[in-house]
C-alpha cells in the first residue's frame, strides 16, 4: 500500500457508511479473500486504485478491503 496513508480516509465522517456499504456487498468476502491470497502476495505495495482497476471493483470496496487487511496484519 505504497506511500498511501489509508488512515486519512478513516478520519472522514462518512468512513463508517462506506464500510457498512462494502460489508453488505455480496462479493465482498470473496474479493477480500482473493486480494489477500493472490494480489497482496504478489504485489504487497499495490494501491487501492490499482486493485479497483485490476478487479473491476469500486475504489471504495478496494480501499476498505486494503485497510482491513493492513489492520489485520498489524494485529
Q: Residues of each region from the PLM?
A:
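Long, charge-rich, low-complexity intrinsically disordered regions
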Residues: 1-75
Amino acid at each position: 500500500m505504497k506511500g498511501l496513508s489509508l488512515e486519512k480516509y478513516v478520519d472522514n465522517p462518512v468512513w463508517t457508511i462506506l464500510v457498512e456499504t462494502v460489508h453488505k456487498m455480496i462479493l465482498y468476502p470473496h474479493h477480500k479473500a482473493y486480494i489477500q491470497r493472490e494480489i497482496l502476495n504478489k504485489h504487497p505495495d499495490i494501491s487501492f486504485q490499482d486493485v479497483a482497476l485490476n478487479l473491476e471493483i469500486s475504489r471504495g470496496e478496494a480501499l476498505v478491503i486494503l485497510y482491513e487487511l493492513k489492520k489485520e496484519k498489524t494485529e
